[in-house]
Amino acid sequence: GTGEMIKAALDLGVSKIIIGLGGSITNDAGAGMAQALGAKFLDAHRSEVAVGGGQLDQIRMIDISGLDARLKQVEITIASDVDNPLTGINGASYVFGPQKGATPEMVQQLDQNLAHFAELVSKQLNINVKDIAGAGAAGGLGFGLMVFAGASIRSGVELVIEHTQLAEKIAQADYVFTGEGGIDFQTKFGKTPFGVAQVAKRLNKPVIACTGYIGEGVEDLYNEGVTAIFGIVDGVCDLPTALENGERNLERRCENIA
């Protein structure tokens, strides 16, 4: 897991770690990661809780006395592709839970569990970062990394834009093409097409987005720099067929746009 990978990096003696947070199957606010690095989570009977998103509500005490001391000696940066907070309607559970198979009832419980965990962190560790943009990334791992690893957080797409000098390249372009597997209401929460569109908007360049599917809420993107959005699938087909023909479908759609 992530905690084990951080520990391995510490064993190698690194001074800087960049952790990319995107999709995950977890929803535990980084508690599992923290356990791997030496933290303990105890229930009302002072027994250690086997942490998962469904067990966070059992925790009554957070013990960080055994947390790996080397964490204080490294600079850890989170590169997040979303800016969701930990909890609430735009938080980890409500936005990403359904993608992981959570039912509406499960989503509500998971969100309550994350809120409980965040309250414990606030009261016992005097750290309150649940509302920071990106805290909800990867099932709340952004939150856990800030709390237990002292990580700072940056937009993943901003890091890429900076290192690739994208703004300079867009300034010389007539049109900007971007895209991802699916474009919907989540895209505006820091996904790559949104970041690209923001740069292009500042430079008054039109942005054309191509995507495997167009979901709900894309209308907001038209106010954020996106000029047009095109789906690349020509007709009704199943997912394996769409994936198999993705490259050709994208090529054909771009030819037609041109």
What are these regions (language model features)?
Residues 1-21, 25-258:
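N-terminal loops that bind phosphate or other acidic moieties
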